[in-house]
């Protein structure tokens, strides 16, 4: 892991970020003391679901738990009280 002074980070941000993007961990220092570590973002591996597990989760999920109640309340409403649309 290399060290970069905050001054160098300020003056050459793009260069330091290129090094990080290339896989290098960079410690940022202020007055010679470490204050932060820049590390490259490592993509998370996706965990694939089997078709059976996916369908099981899909069937068990409800997008909006209150939707049924909201629809029941609105079922009797009309727009007659709004008057004619011109």
From Swiss-Prot:
Family the UniProt entry places it in: Belongs to the phD/YefM antitoxin family.
InterPro entries reported in the protein's UniProt record: Antitoxin_Phd/YefM (IPR006442), phD-YefM_TA_antitoxins (IPR051416), YefM-like_sf (IPR036165)
Known role: Probable antitoxin component of a type II toxin-antitoxin (TA) system. The cognate toxin is VapC5.
GO molecular function, one term: toxin sequestering activity
One Pfam family hit: PhdYeFM_antitox
PANTHER family: ANTITOXIN VAPB46 (PTHR35377:SF5), ANTITOXIN VAPB49-RELATED-RELATED (PTHR35377)
Keywords: Toxin-antitoxin system
Subunit structure: Forms a complex with VapC5.
Record comment regarding domains: The C-terminal domain (residues 55-86) does not neutralize non-cognate antitoxin VapC4; exchanging the N-terminus (residues 1-54) with VapB4 however allows neutralization of VapC4, while exchanging the C-terminal domain (residues 55-86) does not.
Protein name, UniProt field: Putative antitoxin VapB5
UniProt record, GO biological process: positive regulation of growth
């Amino acid at each position: 892991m290399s060290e970069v002074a905050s001054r160098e980070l300020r003056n050459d941000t793009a260069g330091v970020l290129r090094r990080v993007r290339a896989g290098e961990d960079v410690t940022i220092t202020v007055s010679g003391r470490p204050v932060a570590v820049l590390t490259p973002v490592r993509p998370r591996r996706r965990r694939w679901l089997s078709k059976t597990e996916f369908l099981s989760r899909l069937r068990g999920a409800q997008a909006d738990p209150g939707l049924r109640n909201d629809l029941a309340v609105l079922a009797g409403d009309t727009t007659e009280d709004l008057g004619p649309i011109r």
